[in-house]
């Protein structure tokens, strides 16, 4: 509990005794052991691990040494135990020992480099991390390991490690005063004890700091949030302030999942006074923070740092047997929200989204996303929100948000002013915190258009660029988006076509699969659905079954299997499957492969390159489910089928016509003809009855739906405007 009851005054102890000498001898012995560990620790092939690493780092200008705690335990268990229990004192000795060893192994140094730099000791451990909620007062001043997400990062500041002070009255200099590490400052002495004959005593508080005689290091403060896996239902995630110095600065950005090795410390709590607003320390109360001595970052964004990252060899063998079974795809889709009746293709699409395709880095440095985005459009009461809630539970990393309560800054990132330092700090939003997982956005249609536009970059490039308050940076948002939206009229109206939805083509084209979910009135289906819902409610009254139903996979196994597949498999498209997909793509673009299905016409809907990439991602996810290195013809066929029943079917209903690549050439010509006639019909600044226009075009044998589509498109472009309770059309430009 160091630093808890310090008086905050400068003092000098002039009464050293035998105990002080014994302590000094003991510290020298500890330093000797640390030096011996760095010099002599070797692995089986007689590779001197730390000695060689220290020399290589020092010569390359990296003045730090990373130590694995397991190696120190193997060398001297007592020494490792002391480092765990008294890290502040022992880290200082360890760094002195490393500096002396570095001095020996790098001598003789070149001219102008004779000065010896300080060495920073960084620690790492394979121990299981502690939850932030479990850090209590008995952990203070001890070495702990925690996991979490970085949500805010400050800029780089300087902190003095050694400083000199001077008396204003008598000019006495007290040099090389040691400043404790961490967020605790230094209390200047209140009195000057220098006595000079014939001079009055120096006044109170005469000392000032000499900046040019101080030795400083870089430091940065971070804000760590506990992992969503460990947050109890209905509670707010806990936060902890982190203090990083020297080589640990600027290693992470908001959104990174990290493992932190550090010293759980305390600092004074300031309370603003009523008189002048200045903060005054509250007596006896201390706020916790973590002085970081080691950081491990999950740089791949695959959720390697989560509750489900510890997979045993037995579980791994079980997962490989599951992948080898032929029905794993069906079993996984059946296990996805089993209480929801039907929606089999939607469940299969969401299963593919949970596993995702393979992220590719091209030779020119560009990236191709592997995450799959899915949009559910349709009637209320079709279990869209329930599916989103289940995905939040089953995905290893997931963030659930509602469209009405989400702003652009809340979804992407924001720049805020730190109330303590008054500096700007960056905080990541939902899509940054879900890096490597899934963002579930309910009520997607209720979002403001400006907020929806903010996630365009995050959905396709999977980055979020910030240029605010002098901070210009890019954050990762490598996550899938599962969105649910209702029709603009409440229920889906087949006669209205495109008017059912109010989305721009730019956002629609970023979704790999778009499902139109309709509440179909069918007696036999309604009877089956009613039975299923009644059974769900009746079974909920009984005690919960200990095992899932036959063929289903338990939630924990499902979650671990997703994590295992995402971290151990990155399939690519095979050459044969690529050739097949290429030929199918050409057929779909040209319209030669589609037959007329309806009585009037049912022409093929061409797809763009963006939709072709969507089919590739779906194929790779199907291969990943089976832990196969290549996506084959079988996977491509299923991917094309899913794409057919989702986006293509939605496009054929006319609901997505006008979006990128979602209109036939013949339809487009008809739309252009109607638009030209409309513009000739009435001049800019005039208004005409919408009913009269419709009747006029119907007499010319045009479909009402097609005419309404043109009017709706022109209104969206800002060329037309509804007036007088939507009865009149006014031409703006």
Swiss-Prot record:
Q: What is its EC number?
A: 3.6.4.12
Where found in the cell? Answer: Nucleus; Cytoplasm, Cytosol
| BP-aspect Gene Ontology terms | chromosome condensation; DNA endoreduplication; DNA replication initiation; double-strand break repair via break-induced replication; meiotic cell cycle; premeiotic DNA replication; resolution of meiotic recombination intermediates
Where ADP binds, per the record, is at 368
Chief localization: nucleus
Listed Gene3D superfamilies: 2.20.28.10, mini-chromosome maintenance (MCM) complex, chain A, domain 1, Nucleic acid-binding proteins, P-loop containing nucleotide triphosphate hydrolases
Where is the motif Arginine finger annotated in this sequence?
509-512
| Broadest EC class assigned to this enzyme | hydrolase
Identify the InterPro entries for this entry. Answer: MCM (IPR031327), MCM5 (IPR008048), MCM5_C (IPR054125), MCM_CS (IPR018525), MCM_dom (IPR001208), MCM_lid (IPR041562), MCM_N (IPR027925), MCM_OB (IPR033762)
**SUPFAM superfamilies documented for this protein:** Nucleic acid-binding proteins (SSF50249), P-loop containing nucleoside triphosphate hydrolases (SSF52540)
Give the source's domain of life in one word.
Eukaryota
Name the SMART domains for this protein.
Answer: MCM
Q: Does the keyword Nucleotide-binding apply?
A: yes
Keywords from the named record: ATP-binding, Cell cycle, Cytoplasm, DNA replication, DNA-binding, Helicase, Hydrolase, Nucleotide-binding, Nucleus
Give any GO molecular function from the UniProt entry: ATP hydrolysis activity
| Residue stretches making up the MCM domain | 328-534
Q: Name one Pfam family in it.
A: MCM5_C
Per its UniProt record, what PROSITE patterns does this chain match?
MCM_1 (PS00847), MCM_2 (PS50051)
Assembly and interaction partners: Component of the Mcm2-7 complex. The complex forms a toroidal hexameric ring with the proposed subunit order Mcm2-Mcm6-Mcm4-Mcm7-Mcm3-Mcm5.
Q: Which family does it belong to?
A: Belongs to the MCM family.
What does it do?
Acts as a component of the Mcm2-7 complex (Mcm complex) which is the putative replicative helicase essential for 'once per cell cycle' DNA replication initiation and elongation in eukaryotic cells. Core component of CDC45-MCM-GINS (CMG) helicase, the molecular machine that unwinds template DNA during replication, and around which the replisome is built.
- Give the protein name, as stated in the record: DNA replication licensing factor Mcm5
- Native source species: Drosophila melanogaster
């Amino acid at each position: 509990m160091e630093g808890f009851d310090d008086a905050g005054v400068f003092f000098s102890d002039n009464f050293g005794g035998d105990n002080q000498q014994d302590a000094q001898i003991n510290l020298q012995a500890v330093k000797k052991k640390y030096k011996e560990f760095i010099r002599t620790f070797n692995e089986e092939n007689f590779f001197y691990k730390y000695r060689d690493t220290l020399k290589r780092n020092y010569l390359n200008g990296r003045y730090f040494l990373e130590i694995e705690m397991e190696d120190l335990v193997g060398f001297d268990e007592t020494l490792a135990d002391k480092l765990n229990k008294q890290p502040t004192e022992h880290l200082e000795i360890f760094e002195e020992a490393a500096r002396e060893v570095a001095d020996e192994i790098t001598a003789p140094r070149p001219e102008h480099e004779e000065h010896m730099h300080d060495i920073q000791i960084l620690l790492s451990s394979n121990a299981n991390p502690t939850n932030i909620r479990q850090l209590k007062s008995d952990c203070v001043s001890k070495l702990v390991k925690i996991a979490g997400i970085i949500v805010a990062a400050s800029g780089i500041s300087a902190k003095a490690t050694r400083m000199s002070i001077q008396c204003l009255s008598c000019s006495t200099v007290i040099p090389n005063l040691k400043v404790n590490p961490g967020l605790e400052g230094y209390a200047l002495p209140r009195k000057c004890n220098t006595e000079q004959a014939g001079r009055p005593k120096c006044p109170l508080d005469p000392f000032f700091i000499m900046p040019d005689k101080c030795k400083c290091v870089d430091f940065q403060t971070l804000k760590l949030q506990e992992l969503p896996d460990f947050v109890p239902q209905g509670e707010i995630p806990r936060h902890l302030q982190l203090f990083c110095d020297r080589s640990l600065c600027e290693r992470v950005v908001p959104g990174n999942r990290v493992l932190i090795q550090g010293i759980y410390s305390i600092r004074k709590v300031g309370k603003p006074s009523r008189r002048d607003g200045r903060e005054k320390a509250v007596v006896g109360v201390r706020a916790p923070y973590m002085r970081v001595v080691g950081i491990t970052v999950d740089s791949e964004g695959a959720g390697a740092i989560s509750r489900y990252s510890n997979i045993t060899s037995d579980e791994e063998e079980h997962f490989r047997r599951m992948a080898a079974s032929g029905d794993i795809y069906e079993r996984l889709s059946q296990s996805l929200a089993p209480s929801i009746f039907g929606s089999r293709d939607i469940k299969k699409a969401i299963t593919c989204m949970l596993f995702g395709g393979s992220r590719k880095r091209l030779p020119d440095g560009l990236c191709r996303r592997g995450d799959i985005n899915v949009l559910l459009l349709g009637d209320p009461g079709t279990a869209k929100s329930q599916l989103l809630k289940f995905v939040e539970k089953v995905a290893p990393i997931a963030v659930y948000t509602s469209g009405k309560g989400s702003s652009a800054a809340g979804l992407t990132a924001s720049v805020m002013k730190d109330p303590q330092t008054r500096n700007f700090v960056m905080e990541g939003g939902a899509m940054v915190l879900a890096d490597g997982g899934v963002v579930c956005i309910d009520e997607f249609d209720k979002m403001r258009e400006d907020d929806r536009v903010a996630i365009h970059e995050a959905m396709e490039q999977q980055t979020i660029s910030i240029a605010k308050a002098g901070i210009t940076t890019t954050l990762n948002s490598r996550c899938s988006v599962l969105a649910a939206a209702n029709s603009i009229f409440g229920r889906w109206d087949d006669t209205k076509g495109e008017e059912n939805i109010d989305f721009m083509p730019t956002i629609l084209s970023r979704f790999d699969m778009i499902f139109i979910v309709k509440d179909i009135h069918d007696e036999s289906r309604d009877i089956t659905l009613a039975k299923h819902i009644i059974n769900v409610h009746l079974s909920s009254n009984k005690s919960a079954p200990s095992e899932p139903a036959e063929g289903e996979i338990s939630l924990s196994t499902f979650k671990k299997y997703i994590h295992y597949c995402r971290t151990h498999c990155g399939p690519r498209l095979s050459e044969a499957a690529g050739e097949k997909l290429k030929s199918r793509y050409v057929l779909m673009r040209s319209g030669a492969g589609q037959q007329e299905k309806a009585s009037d016409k049912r022409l093929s809907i061409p797809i763009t390159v963006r939709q072709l990439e969507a089919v590739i991602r779906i194929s790779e996810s199907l291969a990943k489910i089976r832990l196969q290195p290549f996506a084959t013809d079988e996977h491509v066929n299923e991917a094309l089928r899913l794409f057919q029943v989702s986006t293509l079917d939605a496009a054929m209903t006319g609901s997505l016509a006008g979006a990128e690549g979602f209109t036939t050439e013949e339809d487009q010509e008809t739309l252009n003809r109607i638009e030209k006639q409309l513009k000739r019909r009435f001049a800019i600044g005039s208004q005409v009855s919408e009913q009269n226009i419709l009747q006029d075009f119907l007499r010319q044998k045009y479909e009402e739906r097609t005419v309404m589509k043109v009017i709706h498109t022109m209104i969206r472009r800002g060329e037309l405007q509804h007036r007088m309770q939507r009865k009149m059309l006014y031409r703006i430009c």
